[in-house]
Amino acid sequence: MKKILGIESSCDDTAISIITERRKILSNIIISQNTEHAVFGGVVPEIAARSHLSNLDQALKNVLKKSNTELTEISAIAATSGPGLIGGVIVGSMFARSLSSALKKPFIAINHLEGHALTARLTDNISYPYLLLLASGGHCQFVAVLGLGKYKILGTTIDDAVGETFDKVAKMLNLSFPGGPEIEKRAKLGNPHKYKFPKPIINSGNCNMSFSGLKTAVRTLIMNLKEVNDSVINDIAASFQFTIGAILSSKMQDAIRLYKQILNDYYEDINHPTKLNLKSFRKDEFNWKPLECITRPKYRIHIQNSYRSNLLNDTIVIAGGVAANKYLQEILSDCTRPYGYRLIAPPMHLCTDNAAMIAYAGLERYNNKLFSPLDFCPKAKWSLEDI
């Protein structure tokens, strides 16, 4: 049985996992660095990289022992090779490539975002294509997931990522790190309508998002309040989370319309293997304008007749650390249901950074013989569209 070993080190969690060709997670080890970074109220890249260097050997021993696996049984080694904090990415990638060289097994460089994008295929075995909202500490984007390595970004944040905004607001409120879970916990105790915060570019008519203005509004409110007690913190957390939900819900509706346009307007419904033709949009424009676009061959995918019914897949996936927020899951589920879509979020432990998603992305690439050279250069920035 094929076994893929995955390594994740793009931020502050050192993670190694082993999965089988049948998508069974044999072991999924995560060594957290929260204690090291909590005193700073955020992740310190240098500390993160040094901790990865110290933790990887032990994480490998733990994952092999827990999965009852010998290193010689590993079929391939997959590792996050970007995007992320470059120090940690280099450490994890070098560790993986060393294993690959020593074991004479294939090395597979994985885009961290692709790991998140494919997690629902690991947990729920969904088919391509589907619409994805990737919401994490470093990214927030709507993506049409058309196939392995075939991604179309429909919209993205033009400033701060949503997860980063959660963490920074939590820090303003003197809540512990990481801030996302703390905001969610406090929000349950507060009044979501106590404070009205701005919803930047919510009516722009496209899928792009902005969170910096919201963050500034929260900071201004806190500075102007005479007292910030527990009750006030709860109300701010609830109002902030409510506003995030409203922004994402509005943008989700824009994303659904654009996603349908991509799948319907450019699909040739004929009686033999067909092509889905996607049009690129100009990078310097927020609005997608098909008539001004040129065809990009990398966004053509061939679909067999047996998959025709899946072309209008009724699934929307939310992934990334922010996807673990139950309130946002409920809000987005209510938003997508009238459009005939079901919302899927991976289990909480697979929403946040983990190596099982990296191993699974590696498995899909292994099955398609998409291997990477040992001199693959890790990347701090790496768009899904550039895989």
Swiss-Prot record:
Its main location: cytoplasm. Pfam families: TsaD. GO terms for molecular function: iron ion binding; N(6)-L-threonylcarbamoyladenine synthase activity. PROSITE patterns: GLYCOPROTEASE. Binds 1 Fe(2+) ion per subunit. Fe cation binds at residues 112, 116, 353. Gene3D superfamilies: 3.30.420.40. Keywords: Acyltransferase, Cytoplasm, Iron, Metal-binding, Transferase, tRNA processing. InterPro entries: ATPase_NBD (IPR043129), Gcp-like_dom (IPR000905), KAE1/TsaD (IPR017861), Peptidase_M22_CS (IPR017860), RPE3 (IPR022437), TsaD (IPR022450). GO terms for biological process: tRNA threonylcarbamoyladenosine modification. It is found in: Cytoplasm. Substrate binds at residues 134-138, 167, 180, 325. Belongs to the KAE1 / TsaD family. Required for the formation of a threonylcarbamoyl group on adenosine at position 37 (t(6)A37) in tRNAs that read codons beginning with adenine. Is involved in the transfer of the threonylcarbamoyl moiety of threonylcarbamoyl-AMP (TC-AMP) to the N6 group of A37, together with TsaE and TsaB. TsaD likely plays a direct catalytic role in this reaction. NCBIfam families: gcp_kae1, RPE3, T6A_TsaD_YgjD. This is tRNA N6-adenosine threonylcarbamoyltransferase. It comes from Rickettsia prowazekii (strain Madrid E). The gene is tsaD.
